[in-house]
Design a protein with these regions (language model features):
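Scaffold/interface architecture of coatomer-like assemblies
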Residues: 26-314
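N-terminal secretory signal peptides that target proteins for export/translocation
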Residues: 1-4
């Protein structure tokens, strides 16, 4: 009996050791996989002080599995290049005119490493008034009053997809500041199943383009309809959240008093971004893979798109 108890105890002890090893290995990052890339914004939870985040502070998860982080580089110095498109809705109310000076000042304040383009959403396309340029003064001249014709831009998400698809690949950060009411007049329904919004998000994330948005009302009935402006801002928020950007002004009806606070916050975000590369698990079929970023550094969040598109395993 004593011998049997000793054998049983030894077996149980071995099983516990194997379980512990399995748990430890599950918590360790995988050492191989497909390189995947994200542009990450470091955002303080309280106040405005952003702590320095080092590579060893960053954790990337696919489900419960932790991936290996191979690169975490500040978007500064020789990696600071930024291509920024200002995308404005030509169906906006004339109230947008009072915000153009704020946008001009924001554009003029950009560093020399930033190229700026200006486009207007019209008939489902992005009509480029100014191609990307390092001449910020020249870019500001492309700003104009919106045409303010109801329905001129049936779906702002058609225009965003058009811009993304025509944007040449680049080693620089690529970001969009979208100014619109967000209302999809082409889709019509107010729900979370808008296929044109979904397609625009997919296109932006696959291209590595971050989209931020500021709400401004459109003309006509939709400019003061609580129902329509509610869904328009929900769509803009979803777009920004899914691409790693930020959406501003949940006011539902009426125009923001000023764009300045939102543009100041956007500028703060642009100066605290990092290039992240990690090794993702190769899927059996090419497709989307959800990822989650985490850090043990207090008072900070890591903001990015929540998924990456991966090729099939070879």
């Amino acid at each position: 009996m004593k011998k049997d108890r000793l054998i049983a105890a030894a077996v149980i002890g071995l099983m516990l050791c194997l379980c512990a090893v399995g748990i430890t290995r599950a918590q360790e990052p995988a050492g191989s996989g497909v390189p995947a890339h994200l542009l990450v914004t470091v955002e303080p939870r309280h106040g405005s002080n952003v702590p320095v985040i080092n590579r060893e502070d960053v954790m990337v998860y696919e489900g419960h599995d932790r991936d290996t982080v191979t690169e975490w580089v500040p978007a500064q110095g020789d990696r600071a290049a930024l291509e920024l498109f200002i995308l404005l809705d030509d169906g906006s109310s004339i109230s947008l005119g009072s915000q153009l000076e704020d946008i001009r000042q924001f554009m003029s304040a950009q560093p020399a490493s930033t190229k700026i383009g200006v486009a207007y959403m019209e008939d489902g396309t992005a009509h480029v008034e100014q191609n990307l340029t390092s001449d910020h003064a020249q870019a500001t001249k492309a700003l104009r009053l919106p045409k303010g014709i109801g329905g001129i831009n049936a779906s702002p998400y058609f225009s965003l997809s058009d811009l993304v698809k025509r944007w040449p690949a680049s080693e620089a950060r690529r970001e969009v500041l979208m100014v619109s009411d967000g209302i999809d007049r082409y889709y019509g329904s107010g729900d979370l199943e808008d296929p044109y919004l979904t397609e625009a998000i997919d296109n932006a994330v696959r291209a590595g383009i971050v989209v931020s948005a500021i709400y401004t009302p459109g003309v006509g009935h939709f400019g003061h309809s609580y129902w329509q402006t509610y869904w328009g801002q929900i769509y803009l928020s979803q777009l920004a959240e899914m691409t790693g950007g930020e959406a501003y002004y949940i006011g539902f009806t009426g125009a923001p008093v000023s764009f300045s606070p939102y543009l100041d916050e956007l500028q703060h975000r642009l100066t605290h971004q990092y290039w992240l590369t990690f090794l993702a698990k190769p899927p059996k079929k090419a497709g989307w893979q959800k990822v989650r970023l985490a850090t043990e550094v207090p008072n900070v969040d890591l903001i990015s798109a929540g998924r990456v598109y991966l090729p099939a395993a070879q």
